[in-house]
Amino acid sequence: MDAEAGSLEEEELELFAMLIDEYESEKFPIELPDPIDAIFFRMDQEGLKQKDLVKYIGSQSKVSEVLNRKRPLSLSMIRKLHRGLGIPAEVLLEEEGGELPAPHEGLNDYPFTEMYKRGYFGFFNGALTEAKEIKEELLTRFFSIFQGMTFTKALPRTSDANKMDEFALEAWQARALTLAEDEEYPPYQLGSLSEDDFKYLVSLSAFANGPLLAREYLQKHGIPFVILKSLPKTYLDGACFKSPSGRPMIALTLRHDRLDNFWFTLLHELAHLYLHLDENNFVFFDETESPLTESELHDPKEKEANGLASKVLIPENEWDLWRSAIGKYVSKADINAFAHSLGISPAISAGRLRWETGDYKKYSAMLGNKAVKKLFQEN
């Protein structure tokens, strides 16, 4: 006999039924269907053949491998099967309550093949063809190093002729962060660097292994210093940004394997760290070989970084006195003597002279060509 609607007996029965459902769910949970079984079930329902799955899975051979459980479902396949056959995402993902992640923006805009060749996906051991089939999964895992952190891109310093590829820059930055995370550093103390530290770093340029000593000095101060080859179409010499933990770091590409470029780029990025990085979550990407563009001339951050780097490398009063005393014709001996008086590498003074005169044919032998990369393990 049914309980009367709205009666106490009906409420007790409803509560009893709910308790039974909860008990059964807890003690006898219903497992999700197997994703391949679910595909076969939908094929049977819809009267589909294997060839009908090509548009979801990619090719006849891939369909066969998936249905024979010899190939895992990729996110791309799962999305198409979910939309096309209506199979719940949690079934295809084999995850109770699982939801498909939003597709990675610009998935096909990253230099994926170059990233693979350079070992950016060190956690993956398959061939390039296999990597391309799970591109989204690999890129999602690779960019997880950012931990959801977003950066305010400062105006990239680059020539008008060279437009930096934003996707390649993002990939390069993620790789630099990954390499930095592989090392251990002491805590970074905010404001611990001073201009005296900068001057000490410049003094290290007098030594053949000065770049290595500079990296060691910065890392002892809790600042990662990464050397990472630039990706195509980035035109990148150096960068400065924070890790997700808030630790500032420097990364150089050694695109121009010269001592003068190394020391100027390093001091330029350190100037950004010292002057600008605490203000916001900035990332600075710099091409330091080209003159400032018209827009950069009006960017105070680039002008300030240039000014501090130049001042620390060679004090303005010392430079002006030397230039007025030496006259128009400057010999290699003059450059060596001036550098020796300052306790710095002659490459720095030779590079400054070439920059100011615009005569890049002179003093090439004094710039420390191919003297930097050989000191570092290339990444």
Over which residues does each language-model region extend?
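N-terminal flexible/basic segments that precede or flank functional cores
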Residues: M1-A38, Q45
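Short, flexible active-site-proximal loops enriched in glycine and acidic residues
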Residues: F28-P35, L48-Q60
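DNA major-groove recognition helix of helix-turn-helix/homeodomain DNA-binding modules
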Residues: S76-V91
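Recognition helix of helix-turn-helix/homeodomain-like DNA-binding domains
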Residues: I57-L73
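Short amphipathic helical patch at the helix-1/turn junction of helix-turn-helix
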Residues: M43-D44, P72
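Active-site hotspot residues in diverse enzymes, especially metal/ion-binding acidic/histidine motifs
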Residues: E11, E24, I30-P35, F41, ...
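Residue-level signal for the short linker/turn that defines the boundary of a DNA-recognition helix
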Residues: L48, G58, L73-S76, A333
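Alpha-helical residues within helix-turn-helix
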Residues: K51-D52, K80, A337
